[in-house]
Amino acid sequence: MAGLKDVVTREYTINLHKRLHGVSFKKRAPRAVKEIKKFAKLHMGTDDVRLAPELNQAIWKRGVKGVEYRLRLRISRKRNEEEDAKNPLFSYVEPVLVASAKGLQTVVVEEDA
């Protein structure tokens, strides 16, 4: 499958509200981190998912129980440059600042490299 081998960057909108429905208040932000990792693993097909510190701050901005309903994410599939890496690729997830995350479509971001 050639599609999984290439390096790509996409922007997604994740609806955390439906993923955190029914989760107790003191576990909402930690569960949001787990759900974002699961989302990135599903869409990028990599087991190694890394979150940007800015994304962690965006999740925890309103405290443990005040997680945003929707977040706009930029997920990049990159090559693992480490010598003894278990996986050849990893996903890097970072937040995108938008006024409102409602109604936005998934977009492939062109890299200027």
From Swiss-Prot:
Location(s) in or outside the cell: Cytoplasm
Give the highest taxon in the source lineage: Eukaryota
Among SMART domains, the record links this protein to: Ribosomal_L31e (SM01380)
Q: Which InterPro entries match?
A: Ribosomal_eL31, Ribosomal_eL31_CS, Ribosomal_eL31_dom_sf
* Alphabetical list of Pfam families matching this protein: Ribosomal_L31e
Q: Name one GO biological process term.
A: regulation of translational fidelity
Entry function: Component of the ribosome, a large ribonucleoprotein complex responsible for the synthesis of proteins in the cell. The small ribosomal subunit (SSU) binds messenger RNAs (mRNAs) and translates the encoded message by selecting cognate aminoacyl-transfer RNA (tRNA) molecules. The large subunit (LSU) contains the ribosomal catalytic site termed the peptidyl transferase center (PTC), which catalyzes the formation of peptide bonds, thereby polymerizing the amino acids delivered by tRNAs into a polypeptide chain.
The misc remark on file is:
There are 2 genes for eL31 in yeast.
Its family remark reads:
Belongs to the eukaryotic ribosomal protein eL31 family.
The subunit field of the Swiss-Prot or TrEMBL record says: Component of the large ribosomal subunit (LSU). Mature yeast ribosomes consist of a small (40S) and a large (60S) subunit. The 40S small subunit contains 1 molecule of ribosomal RNA (18S rRNA) and 33 different proteins (encoded by 57 genes). The large 60S subunit contains 3 rRNA molecules (25S, 5.8S and 5S rRNA) and 46 different proteins (encoded by 81 genes).
This one is known as Large ribosomal subunit protein eL31A
